[in-house]
Amino acid sequence: MIPIKRSSRRWKKKGRMRWKWYKKRLRRLKRERKRARS
């Protein structure tokens, strides 16, 4: 089996990238909602 430490390190990097992308997406969605209201 692959050591957990190695895989967790990999996941941390992926998680950080996903988090940044997720935040960007959330911001975009909020802007679109405001535009739709007005």
UniProtKB/Swiss-Prot annotation:
Signal peptide: none annotated. GO terms for cellular component: ribonucleoprotein complex; ribosome. The keyword Ribonucleoprotein applies. Keywords: Ribonucleoprotein, Ribosomal protein. Initially thought to be part of the large ribosomal subunit. Crystal structures show eS32/eL41 to be a small ribosomal subunit forming a bridge at the interface of the 2 subunits. Belongs to the eukaryotic ribosomal protein eS32 family. Component of the small ribosomal subunit (SSU). This is Small ribosomal subunit protein eS32. It comes from Methanocaldococcus jannaschii (strain ATCC 43067 / DSM 2661 / JAL-1 / JCM 10045 / NBRC 100440) (Methanococcus jannaschii).
